[in-house]
């Protein structure tokens, strides 16, 4: 499995030896949840599929509450919020037999000094990024890209567009906008400018077939419940509902869409990498609002020391 290059999650049942093998890709892109109950193992790519089994109840224990209110929408690798439901952590394998359960990590990022020059490092990163994108363009289903006009999605779309041109094709790109956005938009640390202008500029430059999906506020609100059900746990409210509606629109014509999600974690795109107040915080940047989150809990649950 160390030789696998790509995203995956799979389960193999060895009937002869009476054991089950589960594995997940290095970054944990593909989900794989499981529950072990009364010598039975239930596994699925979604939590809701496991909860559909009557042996598993939809219960959230103390650990789940802590995960949700201290780290949400992120989750500690291996956790799944619900009691008696776990996930195979990224880059992990598990073997379940009648005798025991074995779990091990087959890969992890090594921490070592980079002796490359700035120019060499830049070229190395470029080679890896281009290779990763081109690998995702191989398939027998229609492929498009998300394009917000930011660095990450623009780089992906530009590389994909060039590859499509080499095949005699035109790349389709999609961006999202909101009704009356030009009237109500306010700059923030996470979004200093509106997407539409820059997305259109990039689309024009790379000569893609671009579509701007416009959503209204009423639809965003109405989709909040569906978005939460789709994720199986509470997430980022309107961010999730807008993504759900955006993907539904794209799904009318495309099965696969490449996006710049998670590039901020790799290339330092979040404000807490540079904002002094966030850097000087005594906790994780995403956990600074724990007090506000706890305010909606009932008095019994408030006693949990979520901060720890």
Language-model regions, residue ranges each:
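Cysteine-centered catalytic environments shared across enzyme families
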Residues: 1-230, 243
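Glycine-rich active-site loop/lid subdomains used to bind and stabilize high-energy intermediates
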Residues: 39, 98, 185, 191-194, ...
């Amino acid at each position: 499995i160390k030789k696998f290059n790509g995203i995956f999650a799979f389960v193999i049942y060895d009937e002869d030896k009476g054991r089950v093998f589960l594995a997940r890709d290095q970054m944990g892109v593909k989900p794989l949840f499981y529950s072990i109950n009364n010598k039975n193992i239930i596994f699925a790519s979604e939590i809701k599929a496991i909860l559909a089994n009557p042996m598993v109840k939809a219960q959230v224990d103390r650990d789940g509450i802590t995960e949700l209110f201290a780290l949400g929408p992120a989750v500690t690798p291996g956790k799944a919020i619900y009691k008696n439901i776990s996930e195979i952590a990224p880059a992990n394998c598990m073997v379940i037999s009648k005798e025991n359960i074995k779990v091990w990590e087959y890969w992890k990022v090594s921490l070592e000094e980079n002796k490359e020059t700035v120019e060499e490092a830049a070229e190395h990163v470029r080679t890896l990024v281009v290779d990763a994108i081109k690998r995702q363009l191989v398939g027998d289903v229609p492929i498009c890209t998300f394009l917000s006009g930011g660095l990450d999605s623009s780089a992906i779309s530009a590389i994909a567009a060039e590859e499509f041109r080499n095949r005699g094709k035109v790349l389709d790109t999609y961006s999202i906008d909101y009704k009356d956005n030009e009237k109500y938009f306010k700059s923030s640390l996470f979004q200093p400018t509106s997407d539409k202008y820059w997305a259109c500029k990039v689309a024009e430059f790379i000569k893609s077939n671009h579509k701007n999906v416009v959503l209204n506020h009423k639809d965003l609100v109405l989709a909040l419940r569906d978005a939460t059900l789709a994720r199986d746990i509470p997430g980022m409210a309107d961010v999730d509902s807008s993504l759900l509606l955006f993907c539904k629109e794209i799904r009318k014509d495309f099965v696969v869409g490449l996006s710049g999600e998670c590039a901020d974690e790799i290339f330092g795109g979040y404000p807490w990498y540079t904002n002094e107040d966030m850097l000087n915080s005594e906790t994780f940047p995403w956990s600074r609002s724990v007090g506000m989150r706890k305010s909606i809990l009932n008095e019994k649950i408030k006693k949990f020391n979520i901060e720890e």
